[in-house]
Amino acid sequence: MNDDSNGRRRRPAAFPVGTEDATSRELEQTPRRAPGSFSDKIVMTPDADDPFIETTAAIEALNPPEARPPRRRLSFGKIAAGAFGILISLAVGLWVDRLVRDLFSRADWLGYGAVAVVAIGAAAFLIVVAREIFGMMQLTAVQALKADLAAAAVAGKAQAARAATARLVHLLAGNPRTAKGRARLADTEGEIIDAPHLVDLTERELLAPLDREARRIILGAAKRVSIVTAVSPRALVDLGYVLYESARMIRAMAELYGGRPGTLGLLRLMRDVVAHLAVTGSIAVGDSLVQQILGHGLASKLSARLGEGVINGLMTARIGIAAMDLCRPMPFRALKRPSIGDFLADLAPGAGRTESATGKA
């Protein structure tokens, strides 16, 4: 098609369709900056001249190292406890047998009633034992799954990672917080994903909401311990409430991550947590360390009871972090492990400003 009477053809050109965006036109008209070099040098501040280095080191010193379950070994103490347990069980059985025989000698209906009571008690005892054994096996299965996921990520075997991920999905299937993550992982079943990336994706989708809930549990327990310590009249009350709140927090942490421990399982978890903190030397907080975190001026203005409340709250937070390490079915890879600094601003408002200033520096 000709565009004039001389028969010359129109050259190809581009024409905008519709209205142009005013922002895009302004960007096109704005002249671009020419490349250039900058002569300003980066000044590194030595650690000796850093005014926040002591506070940063003090906060990092409060973070307990990652807790790992100790190896279960057969010791002479366990053998002795088992032997004495069998002996006590035999003694109780003989006493019950003698009691039932004596009741039968007095009256038949008393004997049959005693037999019925013994049968009901034995059945209830067996149910309790079965629940405790199931709880211990569940804790062991969580630790085995944690080791399998870590090994699959290191070895790079996609099939092993898929199998371990499926076990984790089955473990957390009853938790409504993981519904969205389980749906997203189900959409990736037909895709080809490397083992490390699959493990990281599983951690982000399944454990991110659980980690947020675990932080909330730890912070709530630490706040309650701080308040009770500040207002309680006796140190014995402080110790009792710290033990109660720690046991409650550890049980909630285990149930959150699918552990569901019984009484013996809870005692085992508490023993592992306390043993880990005692071995690593992070069970107590020194006064000098608290002064570095809170500031000497603020620490001197605080009352003794309020200072003890902050100390017990920090100790409870460290117990919660160690319990989180033991109960979590995956090691921390893609997500950040919580630290004392995450809870310090809520327990000690003055320390929160110090920590923020440290981060800006």
Curated annotation (Swiss-Prot):
Biased composition (Basic and acidic residues): 22-31
Entry keyword set: Cell inner membrane, Cell membrane, Membrane, Transmembrane, Transmembrane helix
Region (Disordered): 1-40
Membrane topology of the entry: Multi-pass membrane protein
Subcellular compartments: Cell inner membrane
Listed transmembrane segments: 76-96, 109-129
GO cellular component, one term: plasma membrane
Residue ranges that the Swiss-Prot or TrEMBL entry lists as coiled coil: none
Signal peptide residues on this chain, from the entry's feature table: none
Similarity section: Belongs to the UPF0283 family.
NCBIfam families found in the cross-reference section: hyp_HI0043
Protein name (Swiss-Prot/TrEMBL): UPF0283 membrane protein Smed_1530
Native organism: Sinorhizobium medicae (strain WSM419)
